[in-house]
């Protein structure tokens, strides 16, 4: 879960997630929305993949990235349970 919070702590990675809400995209498609190098985009994508927040799959010669909302939902549920448990202690 720490990887998830690290992955979503960066504004560039949050923007990537926001883009992927619209559907699967290639790294090149994603890179068009940023003024940073393609290797930097790849680095951000790898961090998101390691946290399992996104997944990739090959279609022909292209690799498409997609959002994995299950991991995000699990992390949010944990956080909400943590907060709610703290409220009960007051």
Curated annotation (Swiss-Prot):
Residues 1-87 form the HTH arsR-type domain. InterPro entries: ArsR-like_HTH, HTH_ArsR_DNA-bd_dom, HTH_MetalResp_TranReg, SdpR-like_repress, WH-like_DNA-bd_sf, WH_DNA-bd_sf. Induction: By Spo0A during nutrient starvation through its direct negative control of AbrB, repressed by AbrB during regular growth when nutrients are plentiful. Represses its own transcription. Induced by expression of SDP (active peptide of sdpC). SUPFAM superfamilies: Winged helix' DNA-binding domain. Its main location: cytoplasm. GO terms for molecular function: DNA binding; DNA-binding transcription factor activity. It comes from the Bacteria. It is found in: Cytoplasm. One of its GO terms (cellular component) is cytoplasm. Residues 39-62 bind DNA. The keyword Transcription applies. Keywords: Cytoplasm, DNA-binding, Repressor, Transcription, Transcription regulation. GO terms for biological process: regulation of DNA-templated transcription. Represses the transcription of the sdpIR operon and of several other operons that probably contribute to delaying commitment to sporulation. This is Transcriptional repressor SdpR. It comes from Bacillus subtilis (strain 168). The lineage of its organism: Bacteria, Bacillati, Bacillota, Bacilli, Bacillales.
